[in-house]
Amino acid sequence: IPGLIKLSYLLNTDKYDDLIIGCLEYEDSLYSEEYHNWADLRQEGDERYQACAWCHGFGGITASRLACLPYAGVELEQRLKQDLSRAESCFLSLQMRKGMCLCHGNLGMLLLLDKFMEYNSSSGLKYIKDLLVMATLDELEHSHIMPQEKYAKGMMNGMAGIGYACLKLAGVDSLPDIMLCDI
């Protein structure tokens, strides 16, 4: 969706609006008011709404909506903001995960939360971020990195991404925003 919205913006056309709206409607159909999350289609039953990662659940939806926002017209902007409002409750109930990777670990969610807080910050979100930062630093200091992340060198699932996240969270602003695919 971000690619289509940016393309429409750059070409100054509404040619893709129906397609964009259709994609947003499909993703919105996967949202559950009961669970305050988007479905992970790999799972069945209640498990479908437990994902909180960049790759599945509210994390990816949040990243997509934040990436779209600068290029959206007024009508689309309202739809995006509705989803971002939904995402806030997901962030407020965020809990530590076992992994640290960008794709589905703590550092990925911290980067998304940090980006989200540029859009909408609250004392509750700051509290959650502070807790996650402290817990994540403790895990990293004690080398509690899952083997599949420790021995993987990749960006989204490995040590390159963990290093990238540490730099971003330390305030290095010159790096592209990988989580929003701003490369």
Q: What is each model feature region?
A:
Residues 1-183:
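Glycan-recognition and catalytic cores of secretory/periplasmic carbohydrate-active enzymes
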